[in-house]
Amino acid sequence: MVTEKKMVSEKEKMVKLIFTYGTLKQGFSNHVLLQDLITTGDALFIGNYKTHLNYPLVCGPYRVPFLINLPGSGQKVIGELYAVSSSGLSRLDELEGITRSHYQRLPIQLSPLDHQDDDDDGVVLTAGEAYFAHSSYAGKLWNKNGRQGLVGYTEEVARGYVKRKDRPQDRTFMDHIRSFLESQ
């Protein structure tokens, strides 16, 4: 039985709200990391959310999903919101290659998925952060996808996704990005 005191202390150590839109979501390959973080008390599932503004969500090499920091373009993106501890945030940052310029963790405004877009009365926006494609290649990735964004990363969209361990190991993530962007 979880006591109220334990729940309060777990919530107190959560330092960031992280919006996940791709392989970290339930049912996808990298969700195992969030499951581990939940088990250790370093993450807590908050709920299903969507971006308040439109953003481009596209797939890159190996069907890897990327959110692009171009507010007003694309569509409102559906995902999941998690509260994470500083330790959990470090593990997510490592997965997303923050120090290697794979992704950037940036602020984003969110609303509950069940909120009606035509009803702005009384909506409380939630300030979180999301992992966006790094600005060094994001614009080119948007163009490569014909400036067409997705609403969500679904099983159908993810069909053909290749896990990191199954990709060529003699090339870096950025090598894969460059090759994808240069391909016809």
Where are these regions (language model features)?
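Glycine-aromatic micro-motifs
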Residues: 2-184
